[in-house]
Amino acid sequence: MSKIIKIAVDAMGGDNSPKKIIDGINHHYKSNTNTFYQIFGDKEKIQNYINQLPTSSFEIIHTKDLVKGTDSPLEGAKRGKNTSMWLAIQSVKEKKSDIVISAGNTGALLVISKLNLKMIENIDKPALSALWPNKKNMSVVLDLGANIECSPKNLIDFSIMGSSLFKSLYPDDTAKVALLNIGSEEIKGNETIKETYQQLNQRNNTDFEFKGYIEGNQLMNGDVNVIVADGFTGNIALKTAEGTANFITSELKKAMTGNIVGKISSLLNISNLKKFKERLDPRLYNGAIFIGLDSPVIKSHGGTDYIGFSNSLSVCTRIVTGNLIEKIRNNIC
Protein backbone atom coordinates (compact mmCIF):
# COMPACT_ATOMS: atom_id res chain seq x y z
CA MET A 1 0.00 0.00 0.00
CA SER A 2 1.40 3.43 -0.98
CA LYS A 3 2.11 6.08 1.63
CA ILE A 4 -0.63 8.62 2.34
CA ILE A 5 0.53 12.07 1.24
CA LYS A 6 -0.80 14.84 3.49
CA ILE A 7 -1.27 18.24 1.85
CA ALA A 8 -2.11 21.39 3.85
CA VAL A 9 -4.35 23.59 1.67
CA ASP A 10 -5.10 27.29 2.15
CA ALA A 11 -8.63 27.26 0.72
CA MET A 12 -9.22 31.01 0.88
CA GLY A 13 -6.41 32.39 -1.31
CA GLY A 14 -6.72 33.53 -4.92
CA ASP A 15 -9.67 34.34 -7.16
CA ASN A 16 -12.98 32.49 -6.85
CA SER A 17 -11.98 30.72 -3.65
CA PRO A 18 -12.86 28.44 -1.97
CA LYS A 19 -14.86 26.99 -4.91
CA LYS A 20 -11.87 26.83 -7.26
CA ILE A 21 -9.69 25.29 -4.56
CA ILE A 22 -12.19 22.59 -3.61
CA ASP A 23 -13.01 21.81 -7.26
CA GLY A 24 -9.26 21.42 -7.82
CA ILE A 25 -9.02 19.04 -4.86
CA ASN A 26 -11.95 17.00 -6.18
CA HIS A 27 -10.26 16.76 -9.59
CA HIS A 28 -6.84 15.88 -8.12
CA TYR A 29 -8.22 13.17 -5.85
CA LYS A 30 -9.65 11.19 -8.79
CA SER A 31 -6.13 10.11 -9.79
CA ASN A 32 -4.44 10.52 -6.38
CA THR A 33 -6.52 8.56 -3.90
CA ASN A 34 -3.53 8.14 -1.58
CA THR A 35 -3.86 11.83 -0.61
CA PHE A 36 -5.24 13.39 2.58
CA TYR A 37 -6.12 17.09 2.49
CA GLN A 38 -5.98 19.36 5.53
CA ILE A 39 -8.17 22.23 4.35
CA PHE A 40 -7.99 25.61 6.10
CA GLY A 41 -10.75 28.18 5.67
CA ASP A 42 -14.42 29.02 6.13
CA LYS A 43 -16.02 25.65 6.89
CA GLU A 44 -19.52 26.63 5.81
CA LYS A 45 -18.34 27.83 2.39
CA ILE A 46 -16.01 24.86 1.89
CA GLN A 47 -18.72 22.31 2.65
CA ASN A 48 -20.84 23.67 -0.21
CA TYR A 49 -18.37 22.20 -2.73
CA ILE A 50 -16.67 19.23 -1.11
CA ASN A 51 -19.44 16.63 -1.35
CA GLN A 52 -17.60 14.65 -4.06
CA LEU A 53 -14.73 13.77 -1.71
CA PRO A 54 -14.81 10.80 0.72
CA THR A 55 -14.94 12.10 4.29
CA SER A 56 -11.93 9.94 5.17
CA SER A 57 -9.73 11.90 2.74
CA PHE A 58 -9.99 15.39 4.21
CA GLU A 59 -10.28 17.50 7.34
CA ILE A 60 -11.57 21.07 7.48
CA ILE A 61 -9.91 23.40 9.98
CA HIS A 62 -12.29 26.33 10.33
CA THR A 63 -11.23 29.96 10.22
CA LYS A 64 -12.84 33.02 8.69
CA ASP A 65 -9.61 35.02 8.84
CA LEU A 66 -7.67 35.33 5.60
CA VAL A 67 -4.82 37.20 3.95
CA LYS A 68 -6.13 39.58 1.29
CA GLY A 69 -4.62 39.78 -2.16
CA THR A 70 -4.17 43.54 -1.72
CA ASP A 71 -2.17 43.18 1.53
CA SER A 72 1.51 44.02 1.55
CA PRO A 73 3.68 41.09 2.73
CA LEU A 74 3.97 42.70 6.17
CA GLU A 75 0.23 43.44 6.37
CA GLY A 76 -0.51 39.82 5.49
CA ALA A 77 1.76 38.56 8.25
CA LYS A 78 0.25 41.02 10.75
CA ARG A 79 -3.24 39.65 10.16
CA GLY A 80 -2.26 37.07 12.73
CA LYS A 81 -1.86 33.40 13.37
CA ASN A 82 -5.49 32.50 12.69
CA THR A 83 -5.53 33.19 8.94
CA SER A 84 -6.02 30.22 6.63
CA MET A 85 -2.55 30.81 5.14
CA TRP A 86 -0.75 30.95 8.50
CA LEU A 87 -2.56 27.86 9.83
CA ALA A 88 -1.75 25.86 6.69
CA ILE A 89 1.95 26.71 7.01
CA GLN A 90 1.80 25.93 10.72
CA SER A 91 0.56 22.45 9.79
CA VAL A 92 3.77 21.56 7.93
CA LYS A 93 5.85 23.17 10.67
CA GLU A 94 4.24 20.80 13.19
CA LYS A 95 4.69 17.84 10.78
CA LYS A 96 0.93 17.30 10.54
CA SER A 97 1.25 17.67 6.76
CA ASP A 98 4.00 16.88 4.25
CA ILE A 99 3.64 20.01 2.12
CA VAL A 100 1.62 23.23 2.00
CA ILE A 101 -0.06 25.00 -0.92
CA SER A 102 -1.75 28.38 -1.32
CA ALA A 103 -3.12 30.41 -4.23
CA GLY A 104 -3.04 33.54 -2.07
CA ASN A 105 -0.84 36.61 -1.77
CA THR A 106 2.70 35.63 -2.90
CA GLY A 107 4.60 38.15 -0.78
CA ALA A 108 2.66 37.26 2.35
CA LEU A 109 3.15 33.55 1.69
CA LEU A 110 6.92 34.00 1.48
CA VAL A 111 7.08 36.13 4.63
CA ILE A 112 4.82 33.86 6.71
CA SER A 113 6.73 30.80 5.49
CA LYS A 114 10.05 32.34 6.54
CA LEU A 115 8.60 33.30 9.93
CA ASN A 116 7.39 29.77 10.63
CA LEU A 117 9.84 27.43 8.90
CA LYS A 118 13.57 26.98 9.38
CA MET A 119 16.13 27.14 6.60
CA ILE A 120 17.76 23.90 5.51
CA GLU A 121 21.20 23.77 7.11
CA ASN A 122 23.97 25.50 5.08
CA ILE A 123 21.47 27.38 2.88
CA ASP A 124 21.37 31.16 3.41
CA LYS A 125 18.40 32.17 1.26
CA PRO A 126 15.31 30.40 -0.07
CA ALA A 127 14.39 30.73 -3.75
CA LEU A 128 11.18 30.82 -5.76
CA SER A 129 11.25 28.28 -8.59
CA ALA A 130 8.88 27.13 -11.31
CA LEU A 131 8.54 24.69 -14.19
CA TRP A 132 8.88 25.92 -17.78
CA PRO A 133 8.29 23.94 -20.97
CA ASN A 134 11.17 23.48 -23.39
CA LYS A 135 11.54 21.73 -26.75
CA LYS A 136 12.46 18.41 -25.12
CA ASN A 137 10.60 18.29 -21.80
CA MET A 138 10.57 20.70 -18.84
CA SER A 139 13.00 23.01 -17.06
CA VAL A 140 13.26 24.22 -13.48
CA VAL A 141 13.92 27.97 -13.33
CA LEU A 142 14.98 29.88 -10.19
CA ASP A 143 15.09 32.42 -8.54
CA LEU A 144 11.92 34.12 -9.79
CA GLY A 145 11.79 37.05 -7.42
CA ALA A 146 12.45 36.05 -3.81
CA ASN A 147 15.98 37.56 -3.79
CA ILE A 148 16.83 40.67 -5.80
CA GLU A 149 20.54 40.52 -4.90
CA CYS A 150 22.50 37.27 -4.66
CA SER A 151 26.06 36.25 -3.84
CA PRO A 152 27.95 33.49 -5.68
CA LYS A 153 27.18 31.16 -2.74
CA ASN A 154 23.45 31.89 -3.12
CA LEU A 155 23.55 31.06 -6.83
CA ILE A 156 25.49 27.86 -6.16
CA ASP A 157 22.89 26.92 -3.53
CA PHE A 158 20.16 27.64 -6.09
CA SER A 159 21.93 25.33 -8.55
CA ILE A 160 21.94 22.53 -5.99
CA MET A 161 18.34 23.13 -4.92
CA GLY A 162 17.13 23.45 -8.52
CA SER A 163 18.83 20.23 -9.59
CA SER A 164 17.40 18.46 -6.51
CA LEU A 165 13.93 19.72 -7.45
CA PHE A 166 14.37 18.56 -11.04
CA LYS A 167 15.49 15.08 -9.91
CA SER A 168 12.57 14.78 -7.49
CA LEU A 169 10.16 15.51 -10.35
CA TYR A 170 12.04 13.67 -13.13
CA PRO A 171 14.10 10.95 -11.40
CA ASP A 172 15.12 9.22 -14.64
CA ASP A 173 16.67 12.33 -16.22
CA THR A 174 20.04 14.00 -15.62
CA ALA A 175 19.95 17.51 -14.16
CA LYS A 176 21.83 19.98 -16.42
CA VAL A 177 22.45 23.39 -14.84
CA ALA A 178 23.17 26.71 -16.58
CA LEU A 179 23.50 30.30 -15.36
CA LEU A 180 21.31 32.88 -17.12
CA ASN A 181 23.63 35.55 -18.52
CA ILE A 182 23.97 38.19 -21.25
CA GLY A 183 26.32 35.99 -23.27
CA SER A 184 27.83 32.52 -23.42
CA GLU A 185 31.50 33.59 -23.20
CA GLU A 186 33.30 33.32 -19.86
CA ILE A 187 34.17 37.04 -19.84
CA LYS A 188 30.50 38.13 -20.07
CA GLY A 189 28.40 39.19 -17.08
CA ASN A 190 28.94 40.92 -13.74
CA GLU A 191 31.46 39.84 -11.11
CA THR A 192 28.89 37.77 -9.19
CA ILE A 193 27.90 35.66 -12.18
CA LYS A 194 31.54 35.21 -13.28
CA GLU A 195 32.63 34.12 -9.80
CA THR A 196 29.70 31.68 -9.64
CA TYR A 197 30.73 30.27 -13.01
CA GLN A 198 34.30 29.70 -11.82
CA GLN A 199 33.21 27.98 -8.61
CA LEU A 200 30.66 25.72 -10.33
CA ASN A 201 33.21 24.85 -13.01
CA GLN A 202 35.71 23.75 -10.37
CA ARG A 203 33.18 22.05 -8.09
CA ASN A 204 32.75 18.27 -8.10
CA ASN A 205 29.10 18.32 -9.17
CA THR A 206 28.01 14.73 -8.60
CA ASP A 207 24.33 15.75 -8.45
CA PHE A 208 24.20 17.65 -11.76
CA GLU A 209 26.10 18.55 -14.93
CA PHE A 210 27.19 22.18 -15.13
CA LYS A 211 26.71 23.54 -18.65
CA GLY A 212 28.00 27.10 -18.22
CA TYR A 213 26.00 30.13 -19.36
CA ILE A 214 22.68 30.33 -21.16
CA GLU A 215 21.20 33.39 -22.89
CA GLY A 216 17.58 34.49 -22.78
CA ASN A 217 16.87 33.34 -26.34
CA GLN A 218 18.00 29.79 -25.46
CA LEU A 219 15.76 29.19 -22.43
CA MET A 220 13.33 26.95 -24.31
CA ASN A 221 15.89 24.96 -26.35
CA GLY A 222 16.00 22.06 -23.91
CA ASP A 223 19.79 21.76 -23.88
CA VAL A 224 19.68 22.41 -20.11
CA ASN A 225 16.89 21.78 -17.62
CA VAL A 226 17.87 23.84 -14.56
CA ILE A 227 18.26 27.58 -15.18
CA VAL A 228 19.69 29.73 -12.37
CA ALA A 229 19.48 33.51 -11.93
CA ASP A 230 19.12 36.12 -9.22
CA GLY A 231 15.51 37.06 -8.43
CA PHE A 232 15.62 40.34 -10.39
CA THR A 233 16.79 38.72 -13.63
CA GLY A 234 14.67 35.61 -13.17
CA ASN A 235 11.46 37.54 -12.58
CA ILE A 236 11.96 39.63 -15.71
CA ALA A 237 12.61 36.45 -17.71
CA LEU A 238 9.44 34.89 -16.29
CA LYS A 239 7.22 37.88 -17.09
CA THR A 240 8.73 38.17 -20.59
CA ALA A 241 8.05 34.48 -21.30
CA GLU A 242 4.47 34.74 -20.01
CA GLY A 243 3.82 37.85 -22.09
CA THR A 244 5.29 36.26 -25.22
CA ALA A 245 3.16 33.14 -24.80
CA ASN A 246 0.01 35.25 -24.36
CA PHE A 247 0.89 37.32 -27.44
CA ILE A 248 1.46 34.24 -29.62
CA THR A 249 -1.79 32.52 -28.61
CA SER A 250 -3.77 35.76 -29.01
CA GLU A 251 -2.36 36.52 -32.48
CA LEU A 252 -2.79 32.92 -33.61
CA LYS A 253 -6.42 32.98 -32.53
CA LYS A 254 -7.04 36.19 -34.48
CA ALA A 255 -5.32 34.80 -37.58
CA MET A 256 -7.36 31.60 -37.50
CA THR A 257 -10.75 33.24 -36.91
CA GLY A 258 -10.39 36.57 -38.73
CA ASN A 259 -11.71 35.49 -42.14
CA ILE A 260 -13.04 32.49 -44.03
CA VAL A 261 -9.57 31.37 -45.18
CA GLY A 262 -8.30 31.42 -41.62
CA LYS A 263 -11.32 29.48 -40.38
CA ILE A 264 -10.88 26.80 -43.06
CA SER A 265 -7.16 26.56 -42.28
CA SER A 266 -7.87 26.14 -38.58
CA LEU A 267 -10.37 23.35 -39.29
CA LEU A 268 -7.84 21.53 -41.47
CA ASN A 269 -5.19 21.82 -38.76
CA ILE A 270 -7.41 21.39 -35.70
CA SER A 271 -5.41 18.50 -34.23
CA ASN A 272 -2.05 20.30 -34.47
CA LEU A 273 -3.54 23.56 -33.21
CA LYS A 274 -5.02 21.79 -30.20
CA LYS A 275 -1.61 20.32 -29.33
CA PHE A 276 0.03 23.73 -29.76
CA LYS A 277 -2.56 25.41 -27.52
CA GLU A 278 -2.14 22.77 -24.83
CA ARG A 279 1.65 23.17 -24.93
CA LEU A 280 1.27 26.88 -24.09
CA ASP A 281 -1.52 26.40 -21.54
CA PRO A 282 -0.19 28.00 -18.30
CA ARG A 283 -2.47 25.78 -16.21
CA LEU A 284 -0.27 22.79 -17.06
CA TYR A 285 2.74 24.46 -15.42
CA ASN A 286 0.95 25.99 -12.44
CA GLY A 287 2.70 25.72 -9.12
CA ALA A 288 5.77 27.72 -8.11
CA ILE A 289 7.96 26.08 -5.46
CA PHE A 290 9.50 28.01 -2.55
CA ILE A 291 12.60 25.96 -1.74
CA GLY A 292 15.36 26.24 0.81
CA LEU A 293 13.10 25.93 3.85
CA ASP A 294 12.87 22.66 5.78
CA SER A 295 9.35 22.04 4.45
CA PRO A 296 8.23 22.58 0.84
CA VAL A 297 5.82 25.45 0.11
CA ILE A 298 3.88 25.59 -3.17
CA LYS A 299 2.38 28.78 -4.63
CA SER A 300 -0.46 28.32 -7.10
CA HIS A 301 -1.26 31.22 -9.42
CA GLY A 302 -4.12 33.19 -7.88
CA GLY A 303 -5.91 33.62 -11.20
CA THR A 304 -5.83 30.00 -12.35
CA ASP A 305 -8.94 27.80 -12.50
CA TYR A 306 -9.58 24.47 -10.81
CA ILE A 307 -7.59 22.57 -13.47
CA GLY A 308 -4.55 24.73 -12.79
CA PHE A 309 -4.94 24.27 -9.04
CA SER A 310 -5.28 20.52 -9.51
CA ASN A 311 -2.02 20.52 -11.47
CA SER A 312 -0.28 22.39 -8.65
CA LEU A 313 -1.56 19.71 -6.25
CA SER A 314 0.05 17.14 -8.56
CA VAL A 315 3.35 19.04 -8.17
CA CYS A 316 2.88 18.67 -4.40
CA THR A 317 2.40 14.92 -4.77
CA ARG A 318 5.49 14.49 -6.95
CA ILE A 319 7.68 16.60 -4.67
CA VAL A 320 6.75 14.58 -1.58
CA THR A 321 7.13 11.28 -3.44
CA GLY A 322 10.49 12.44 -4.83
CA ASN A 323 11.85 13.32 -1.34
CA LEU A 324 12.86 16.86 -2.35
CA ILE A 325 13.97 18.08 1.08
CA GLU A 326 16.10 14.98 1.69
CA LYS A 327 17.73 15.38 -1.73
CA ILE A 328 18.66 18.99 -0.97
CA ARG A 329 20.09 18.07 2.44
CA ASN A 330 22.21 15.30 0.91
CA ASN A 331 23.52 17.49 -1.92
CA ILE A 332 24.14 20.74 -0.04
CA CYS A 333 26.79 19.24 2.28
Curated annotation (Swiss-Prot):
Function: Catalyzes the reversible formation of acyl-phosphate (acyl-PO(4)) from acyl-[acyl-carrier-protein] (acyl-ACP). This enzyme utilizes acyl-ACP as fatty acyl donor, but not acyl-CoA.
EC number(s) recorded for this UniProt protein: 2.3.1.274
Single Gene Ontology BP annotation: phospholipid biosynthetic process
Catalytic activity: a fatty acyl-[ACP] + phosphate = an acyl phosphate + holo-[ACP]
Subcellular location: Cytoplasm
Gene Ontology molecular function: phosphate:acyl-[acyl carrier protein] acyltransferase activity
Protein name in UniProt: Phosphate acyltransferase
Complex formation: Homodimer. Probably interacts with PlsY.
Keyword Transport: no
Gene Ontology cellular component annotations, sorted alphabetically: cytoplasm
SUPFAM superfamilies linked: Isocitrate/Isopropylmalate dehydrogenase-like
Biochemical pathway: Lipid metabolism; phospholipid metabolism
Family classification: Belongs to the PlsX family.
